[in-house]
Regions:
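Nucleotide-sugar-dependent
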Residues: 95-105, 127, 252, 346-349, ...
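Donor nucleotide-sugar binding/catalytic pocket of nucleotide-sugar-dependent glycosyltransferases
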Residues: 1-12, 282-299, 303-322
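A short, well-ordered alpha-helix in the C-terminal region of glycosyltransferases
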Residues: 148, 152, 158-163, 468, ...
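Short acidic/histidine- and often glycine-rich active-site loop of Leloir-type glycosyltransferases
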Residues: 122-133, 137, 419, 439-450, ...
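Conserved catalytic-core segment of nucleotide-activated headgroup transferases in glycan assembly
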Residues: 7-78, 171-194, 312-322, 328-403
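A short alpha->beta transition loop at the rim of the catalytic pocket in nucleotide-sugar-dependent
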Residues: 91, 114, 405, 430-433, ...
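Membrane-proximal helix-turn-helix segments that form the acceptor-binding/catalytic region
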Residues: 233-237, 250, 266-287
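Conserved acidic donor-binding segment of nucleotide-sugar-dependent glycosyltransferases
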Residues: 75, 136-143, 153-154, 449-460, ...
Length: 506
């Protein structure tokens, strides 16, 4: 018999603790038959005896437990479990079910993460836990027995004996955007995987923050100068550094003014916006950037200040979402372009001739376009081969990208575009789709041409390499497999540039 299986879950390896308490984790929906009464009794004992123990439920409780030692996250997605485990500094998970179950998905998820787990000696989950090297069987079905187990068990002791890291970083944003997920959420995940906790607030709420609780501040694309100036002044009095995180060349209008999308009416005040960004950058102590090209530009324009590169990486939730996608076999070959915003109209325009040519020559070639891009009128001639999607959530994006056989990443030849990161290559590689991209200094420093992607310096190379990928399925699979392996090794949140870490915590 083959037991139930769940998909990929990353291993959780806590380097240290972020709290001084022993934290018992629960996972899922807590009901009476799932052990809710025992959990309530355990919380009562912890509170009554003033024990340094907390109960943290990743999920929701149907049992009313009104205790300061008990907390719940509320509804969660499966992909969020590893991050929530780290953020709540969970030391050991408890499966408190008093009802014999045939299979427990939550037990399997916890074991896949490599976390210690304890349960009562009933049902199929107990059989799995007995065979697990971090499994603990509680001898009696009672709150007292649970407490004695966590007090005396060596596995629990090893988990809680880790050093407590009190370092903490404050992140400040002006608004939440697609980019802020990469630059803030993923950086926060990198930190918590190193055992460093953080908070994130809006710039308008910083006046409520007790800055003494933090070691440093990271602000992302803030343009509100007066508010940032006040925050910087408070930080300076505490001898605390403020870092500006930025992932686009948007602080020197004269250098980028000729870019096509800036001629749109929605960018009429963009020069003023770039000036505000620059003013905010100037009062900060250092910079965190996403690319080597951006690092070079900032070092030239803000000499004497610290600049560190922290490349965009995939969050644990993003990886889980991507690895659950199943490729669907189809007869046609789909070329995908996942642009996001209309700022990429001119990027697409740069390869329209080569793309139209292959589509007109072969009706079996389809184009899948997602985002706000406005397709050139010439594509009306092949409209039956075109499928379009508007914006989708990042959680849905892997499923959409996986529909493609080839991912397009054209970029205009400008310093603005050279400062952009390899996100689109990474997202496609996660779902085993090969990328063909424009060659510039930045992408050439990342993508290995012919090994884990294709780079094109002119229209002739676009035509040649696109046709090569279309004709050769084994080549597509080879490129995709190499890129996927590299992403899984080098682009995870368990990997972080030590230079970035040292700068933030200096």
């Amino acid at each position: 018999m083959i037991p139930h299986q769940i998909g990929y879950m990353p291993q959780i390896e806590k380097e240290n603790k972020t709290t001084k308490t022993l934290n018992i984790g629960l996972l899922g929906v807590l009901t009476k038959h799932k052990g809710g009464t025992i959990v309530a009794e355990l919380a009562e004992k912890i509170e009554r005896e003033n024990l340094d123990v907390r109960i943290k439920l990743i999920g929701t409780s149907c049992v009313d437990i009104n205790s300061p030692v008990f907390s719940q996250t509320g509804a969660y997605t499966r992909g969020a479990i590893p991050r929530l485990t780290l953020e709540n500094d969970i030391d050991v998970f408890l499966i408190p079910s008093i009802w014999p179950e045939t299979f427990s998905y939550t037990t399997e998820e916890i074991m896949k993460m490599g976390m210690p787990i304890m349960c009562f000696d009933i049902g199929a989950p107990a059989e799995r836990v007995k065979k697990y090297d971090k499994g603990i069987i509680i001898p009696a079905i009672s709150a007292e027995s649970v407490y004695q187990t966590i007090r005396d068990n060596q596995i629990v002791k090893e988990s809680t004996d880790k050093k407590v890291n009190s370092q903490k970083v404050l992140f400040v944003v002006q608004e939440v955007t697609f980019s802020s997920r990469y630059r803030i959420d993923h950086l926060r995940e990198q930190l918590i995987r190193k055992g460093i906790s953080s908070d994130c607030v809006s710039i308008k709420d910083t006046k409520k923050c007790d800055l003494k609780a933090y070691n440093s501040i990271v602000v992302y694309r803030i343009s509100e100068y007066e508010k940032l100036k006040k925050l910087k002044s408070k930080a300076k009095k505490l001898n605390m550094q403020v870092f500006y995180d930025i992932d686009d060349y948007i602080f020197n209008y004269q250098a980028i003014k000729d870019i096509g999308f800036l001629k749109g009416k929605e960018y009429r005040n963009y020069e003023n916006y770039t000036e505000q960004i620059r003013n905010c950058m100037e009062i900060c102590d250092g910079y965190i950037v996403s690319t080597l090209s951006l690092e070079k530009v900032i070092k030239e324009q803000f000499p004497g200040k610290v600049v560190v590169v922290n490349r965009n990486v995939a969050s644990m939730e993003m990886v889980i979402a991507s690895l659950t996608v199943e490729k669907v076999h189809k007869d046609n070959i789909t070329i995908g372009y996942f642009s996001g915003t209309k700022t990429h109209n001119d990027d697409f325009e740069s390869i329209k001739g080569e793309l139209l040519s292959v589509m007109q020559e072969n009706e079996n070639i389809h184009l899948l376009v997602a985002g706000q891009i406005e397709l050139p009128a010439e594509f009306n001639a092949v409209k039956d081969q075109v499928e379009t999607f508007k914006f989708v959530s990042w959680q849905e994006l892997p499923h959409l990208i996986a529909k493609a056989d080839i991912n397009l990443m054209p970029l205009e030849n400008s310093i603005f575009h050279e400062c952009k990161s390899e996100n689109k290559w990474m997202e496609a590689a996660l779902v085993n789709v090969p990328t063909i991209a424009s060659r510039n200094n930045e992408l050439a420093s990342v993508i290995r041409d012919g090994e884990d992607g294709f780079l094109c310096k002119n229209s002739e190379e676009w035509a040649e390499k696109l046709n090569k990928l279309i004709r050769d399925e084994s080549l597509r699979n080879q490129i995709a497999s190499s890129a996927h392996a590299r992403i899984m090794k080098e682009y995870m949140t368990d990997d972080m540039e030590m230079e970035t870490l040292r700068a933030i915590l200096k």
